[in-house]
Amino acid sequence: MDNTLTLIKTVYEINQLEEIAAPQIILAGRSNVGKSSLINCLASRKKLAKISSTPGKTRSLNYYEVSPHGYYIVDLPGYGYARCSKTERAKWAKLIDKYLLDNAYVAAAAVLLDSRHNPQQNDLDLISYFKHCNIPIIPIMTKSDKTKQKDRSKVQKKWEDILKVKPICVSSKTGMNRTRLWNLLDVTAIPELAEIEEETE
């Protein structure tokens, strides 16, 4: 049975935050890295997450429920977009900090990395932030259809050297590694699913 995604909640302000007692996987990455496209790819729907030609359009925390497993993918605002004001960026930072504060339900952070570029300081800073919060990292290299295998492998190796884990390469356009990514997200959010898979093999 294929997973389905449903947008359950959108949070713009700190006072809208409330505890959701279910496993959560954060989806984070630079503006224009392809977060909305990846959500739509995972959901097999074109318009679940709005895609904009303007980077940094996601300005809220978006909670997507994953059925049938009952965990959540929480899409964070994109970072690194210069045209957003300092005030707005500070507001997002406070919202994200508050969301993470004492949130025992965060299972991991899926950090999206553009496969066309070498490691960027913005990405390294974000990964350091999550590690400081003791949040495991799932590195995902997006837009893999736009790169040659040889070039992509070089970037992948650089990230593997930094993170000590090999990023998964995906493409929202072609669906590359979609099923593999779903399996990874499932067992990260609910480790018991890995045991069930082993029993059915």
Swiss-Prot record:
InterPro entries: G_ENGB_dom, GTP-bd, GTP-bd_ribosome_bio_YsxC, P-loop_NTPase. NCBIfam families: GTPase_YsxC. One of its GO terms (biological process) is division septum assembly. It comes from the Bacteria. The keyword Repressor does not apply. The lineage of its organism: Bacteria, Pseudomonadati, Thermodesulfobacteriota, Desulfovibrionia, Desulfovibrionales. One of its GO terms (cellular component) is cytosol. It comes from Maridesulfovibrio salexigens (strain ATCC 14822 / DSM 2638 / NCIMB 8403 / VKM B-1763) (Desulfovibrio salexigens). Transmembrane segments: none annotated. Mg(2+) binds at residues 36, 58. Residues 21-191 form the EngB-type G domain. Keywords: Cell cycle, Cell division, GTP-binding, Magnesium, Metal-binding, Nucleotide-binding, Septation. GTP binds at residues 29-36, 56-60, 75-78, 142-145, 168-172. The keyword GTP-binding applies. Necessary for normal cell division and for the maintenance of normal septation. One of its GO terms (molecular function) is metal ion binding. Pfam families: MMR_HSR1. PROSITE patterns: G_ENGB. Its cofactor is Mg(2+). This is Probable GTP-binding protein EngB.
